[in-house]
Design a protein with these regions (language model features):
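Short active-site loop at a secondary-structure junction
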Residues: 31-42, 63-123, 184-198, 273-276, ...
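Residue-level preference for non-acidic, small/hydrophobic
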Residues: 29, 43, 48, 80, ...
């Protein structure tokens, strides 16, 4: 059954709390574009009955393609929650999946690895002691800067998949990714340390349990209700004029990353991962979040969602996490410091490296989405973080 999402219209009325700040929000985004924090952006705000959905700027600083509300952004690590966490929530609902199980129960090749004892619940809350990331591209680059032809090709073949517009990676490279993960060591188990490694394994976990590949499982369980407007590898079904580019990759792919996922590890997995890989517009992402948080949601049991979005780290107020989801953080005296002091403790969300963020606060009836490509043309300068653009937006909203 498909749910028809109501067309978003801008309802501006002085009756609503933050509508008077719309001009200030527009000014902040416009000024950020002038300062080259990002060339363009989409913003979606729903608070009570007030909805504001607007696009700003252009795909790049050459000002050729204007951002429209249906254009797609690389969501980066937001994928961890609206693909990875959602998939596992659905496993809990449909397959009685036990998140307290060690991963060796589902990955036989981890039985001899010390990582095999790590529990799913700890991996989702980033307290399993896994290292943050592995720089897989460095294993593919020769000393002279050329890519190793054993795994990378500039020709499409039956045994490879798209890495970028010009490059292809062998289908079997995932085995190399998993092998390197298995060789890592644990450090400070029980302490918070953000890690994306387990999220690279979730597609295989889903396939092992359901017999369905990760992308189809998500489409059938969630994205079909949004008319498949959240998607992996958008270049397959969308013109590039509707996909916002991310970065001019001068380290690995040596080209503008456009239509393929920006995250290198996810790209080496063919663009389909729970670590990164989803593309969406702000409106489509907000509609998914709205459906998720309905009391009688057709997407997931509300009790499961509540469990996954509750704080799992009880002894560290500076690092509050749900199961995949980010939470409001506190200092020792109880004051909220991230992402905003007026958000409730039950609120949750996530950010993405490409310059994306969403936050949901049921108590304040708030859904906030900001999508940008702040890594364009390069990731070197983090102006989005340094200028606290997201925090300033929340200040105006709340």
């Amino acid at each position: 059954m498909k749910i028809k999402i109501l067309t978003v219209i801008i309802l501006i009325s002085c009756h609503f709390g933050f509508s008077q700040n719309i001009y200030s929000i527009d000014s902040l985004i416009t000024e950020s574009i002038k300062l080259k924090v990002f060339p363009g952006a989409q913003i979606y705000i729903k608070k009570n009955d007030f909805v504001y959905n607007k696009s700003y700027g252009f795909h790049t600083y050459d000002s050729i393609i204007k951002i429209e509300n249906d254009h797609l952004y690389d969501l980066a690590s937001i994928t961890k929650t609206i693909a990875g966490s959602l998939a596992i929530m659905k496993l809990v609902e449909d397959y009685d999946f036990d998140i307290n199980s060690p991963i060796k129960k589902y990955f036989k090749d981890f039985k001899r690895s010390e990582l095999g004892e790590s529990k799913i619940i700890d991996l989702l809350s980033h307290t399993a002691g896994w290292q943050p990331y592995i720089n897989h591209p460095k294993f593919l680059i020769k000393k002279n800067g050329n890519l190793k032809k054993r795994f990378i090709s500039d020709e499409k073949k039956s045994n490879n998949m798209s890495l970028s517009k010009k490059l292809y990676v062998k289908n079997s490279f995932y085995d190399q990714i998993k092998k390197r993960i298995k060789k890592t060591t644990l450090n400070k188990v029980g302490k918070y340390k953000y890690s994306g490694l387990f999220f690279c394994l979730i597609p295989e976990l889903v396939k092992n349990i359901t017999g369905t590949d990760f992308e189809n499982y998500l489409n059938n369980s969630f994205y079909k209700f949004l008319n498949y407007k959240l998607t992996f590898n958008p270049y397959k079904n969308h013109t590039l004029k509707k996909i916002v580019p991310t970065e001019i990759d001068q380290f690995f792919r040596q080209e503008l990353v456009h239509g393929n996922v920006h995250d290198e590890t996810s790209a080496l997995m063919g663009g389909i991962s729970a670590n990164s890989g989803l593309f969406s517009s702000a409106e489509s992402l907000a509609n998914l979040l709205f459906l998720l948080t309905l009391e009688n949601s057709i997407l997931i049991n509300s009790n499961i969602l509540k469990n996954f979005t509750q704080n799992q780290i009880k002894n560290d107020t500076l690092n509050q996490r749900g199961l995949g989801f980010d939470k409001v953080r506190f200092v020792s005296n109880g004051s909220k410091i991230y992402p905003h002091r007026n958000l409730s403790k039950d609120s949750f969300g996530h950010t993405g490296f490409t310059g994306t963020m969403y936050w949901i606060d049921p108590e304040n009836d708030l859904i906030f989405v900001l999508l940008t490509n702040s890594v364009y043309p390069s990731r070197e300068k983090n102006k989005l973080g340094n200028l606290k653009v997201r925090e300033k937006l929340l200040e105006l909203i709340l």
